[in-house]
């Protein structure tokens, strides 16, 4: 165990030592600026972070409602037959490597966006669509787990009080599964951020 920690400390010291030129040669002000011109020696990281943030927020805005909605449909509304068909497909999509999604985006989505906007299709809108498609299966799978963890007795108590199915979903099931849904969204966001860096 101590050997493992020693290796971690050695790596940390090496990484810190290797990163020192960023602070000594470039400087913190230039490093955290919006100027990115490597040929001129300007390595501002803020434009890269802003782009990653913009694309991640757009992907979440598109992917979260679709992922949570799909999970609610599969757990609360869909028949067993539909569930048996769609659930394995969602699990399969969650395991597809990111490079495949990127290729799909370049071949299918980019030309569609280019035709729609009249541009080349290289931009935030294309990235939003690709990342949203990428994070939906992750959010859906984890939200399904969160919804399935809610005891059936809670739903039955809601029905016994006269609530409709939609009232039960909106007022009882979703609030009870809120923490699991937030976890699903955070993991989806992590995947989106990881792909934009």
What are these regions (language model features)?
Residues 142-143, 165-197:
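Transmembrane alpha-helices
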Residues 48, 52, 88-91, 95, ...:
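Residue-level signal for discrete positions within transmembrane alpha-helices
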Residues 91-135:
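Generic hydrophobic transmembrane alpha-helix motif, especially the helices
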Residues 97, 161-162, 175:
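Glycine/proline-centered hinge or cleavage motifs at structural transition points of membrane proteins
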Residues 52, 56, 60-72, 76, ...:
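Hydrophobic positions within alpha-helical transmembrane segments of bacterial inner-membrane proteins
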Residues 2-9:
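Short, small-residue-biased leader/transition segments that mark boundaries at the very start
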Residues 66-105, 142:
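Cytoplasmic-entry segments and transmembrane alpha-helices of multi-pass inner-membrane transporters
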Residues 17-59, 79-80:
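Periplasmic/extracellular loop-to-transmembrane helix junction in inner-membrane transport proteins
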